[in-house]
């Protein structure tokens, strides 16, 4: 099963108003790549809604790396089906979130939330706690209120686990409800 999810803000785990997005990203390892503050301001002034994507989903202007150095130059020529639908509805991509490299398909003993490109994503409730699951960067972005909505993927706990340990709600639509084109899959 390979399922998509929207992570909705449930409650921010910390009062982060004194920190910039860049400071939060630096501390918690949320993004692999992101728009500049100037680009974000332009989109916001046009009334668009920011969204974060797990870095295994195609989005024009961003490399789709699955967190791996091997795919660092993998720039798609079109958006994933899901991404295009979101853009058509008034969203813009704020950035690509860190993930467990290859969506945790490296080893049965690999570390959740670690990739060679993004380093280690940290759990905002406890820096020594597991951020849990390959969609951990997306979950942490929502938990820190860096975005209100983020997209993740799941084969085996990659949405449910980071949602539960980062204090947010993860929704998994029925398999087949949303096209999986433009996604680097593990199943």
Model-found features: residue ranges?
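Short, well-ordered alpha-helical
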Residues: 13-75, 79-80, 98-104
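Alpha-helix termination/capping residues and helix-transition junctions
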Residues: 7, 25, 143-144
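Sec-dependent signal peptide recognition
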Residues: 1-6
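Short glycine/serine-rich loop segments
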Residues: 80, 87-187
